[in-house]
Amino acid sequence: MRDLSSDHRWMSLNTATVRKQGALLDIIEACARHGIRAIDPWRDQVAATGIDRAAKAIRDAGLALSGYCRGGMFTADAARRIEARDDNRRAVDEAKMLGAACLVLVAGGLPQYSRPGSTPSKDI
C-alpha cells in the first residue's frame, strides 16, 4: 500500500470532512498549502461561497476537482419527484461550470413497500 503521509499528490479531499474547520475558501487554501492537488466540494459549500468565486479560487490554487457532491435522491415521493429531478439538473450544470470530473450521486433508498421494477426503482 502506498504511503501518502508525506506525498499528497494522489489525494483528493472531500470538503465535507473538514467543513467544521473552515469555509470553502479556507479549505481550498489549506489544500494548496499542504500539497493536496484535488478536492471534492459539496454543493452547499459552493453555494455559500458563490459558484464563480469558488471556481476562480479552485483554479487560482491550482487544484483539480475530482468530483462534485452531490446529486441524487431520485426516489423522492411523487410530490417531490419533479423537484428532485430539477435539482439534479442544476447539480449537473454546476458540476460543468466548476469543471468537475464527475457528479457524485446518492441515489436514495426505495420507498417503503416498493418492489423491483416499480416507478421509484426505475428512476434510479
What are these regions (language model features)?
Residues 1-8, 26-33, 47-68, 90-100:
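Acidic (Asp/Glu)-rich catalytic clusters
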Residues 2-5, 29, 74-124:
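Active-site acidic/histidine proton-transfer and metal-coordination neighborhood
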Residues 7-15, 39-41, 63-70, 103-105:
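Hydrophobic faces of well-ordered beta-strands that scaffold small-molecule active sites
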Residues 9-19, 23-27:
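Short, Lys/Arg-rich amphipathic segments at extreme N-termini
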Residues 18-23, 41-53, 73-82, 111-115:
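Acidic-and-aromatic substrate-binding clefts and catalytic sites of carbohydrate-active enzymes
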Residues 36:
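Conserved acetyl-CoA-binding loop of GNAT-fold acetyltransferases
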